[in-house]
């Protein structure tokens, strides 16, 4: 069984004048990327929120200095993939806003990220997208979605409490696992 990589493709919406420092875009990028890493789709709160997330230059500014402050070249991302990509400018890196990542990546039954296409496999390897931490975070999010649904149903059907208890226990186990894999 496989799962879709993400449900929402980020959309860059900034249309104002180019800023002098790309860091000034961080709040807008966080919003445009739905507070998720553009490459792993993990929510930024698992990494400490917007404060600790980074801004990647799809085309590295060390090699393309004219794109350093170009909003269309910026990707909101976690530090792990930003460091893994570094200043690599291989054309196989796919812009998370211009490509449907569901066509290039999938999650296996455990939530681990895998590439489907040549570009997806390249990125998964280069950016270490198969790290267990990303699967754990995805599973936590899936559990939270299910828990929220059950909590709504429980208002009318309290006999479902054992199911909620089981999901909360799994959620707790994943949180413990995430702490171990930091």
Regions found by a protein language model. Give the residues of each.
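Extended charged
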Residues: 1-14, 22-28, 44-48, 65-73, ...
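A basic- and aromatic-enriched beta-loop-alpha substructure that forms the phosphate/nucleotide-
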Residues: 55, 73-74
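Short cysteine-rich clusters marking metal-coordination/redox-active sites
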Residues: 37-40, 78
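Aromatic-lined ligand-binding clefts that engage carbohydrates, nucleic acids, or primary amines
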Residues: 29-32, 38
């Amino acid at each position: 069984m496989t799962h879709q990589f993400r449900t929402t493709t980020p959309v860059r919406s900034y249309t104002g004048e180019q800023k002098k420092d790309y860091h000034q875009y961080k709040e807008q990028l966080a919003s445009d990327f739905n507070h998720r890493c553009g490459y792993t789709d993990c929510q930024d709160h698992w990494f400490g929120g917007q404060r600790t997330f980074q801004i990647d230059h799809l085309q590295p500014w060390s090699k393309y200095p004219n794109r350093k402050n170009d909003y269309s070249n910026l990707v909101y991302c976690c530090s792990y993939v930003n460091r893994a990509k570094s200043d690599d400018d291989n054309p196989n890196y796919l812009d998370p806003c211009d490509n449907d990542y569901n066509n290039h990546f999938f999650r296996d039954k455990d939530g681990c990220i895998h590439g489907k296409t040549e570009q997806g496999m390249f990125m998964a390897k280069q950016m270490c997208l198969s790290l267990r931490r990303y699967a754990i975070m995805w599973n936590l999010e899936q559990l939270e979605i299910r828990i929220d649904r059950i909590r709504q149903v429980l208002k009318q059907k309290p006999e479902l409490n054992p199911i909620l208890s089981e999901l909360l226990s799994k959620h707790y186990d994943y949180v413990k696992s995430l702490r171990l894999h930091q």
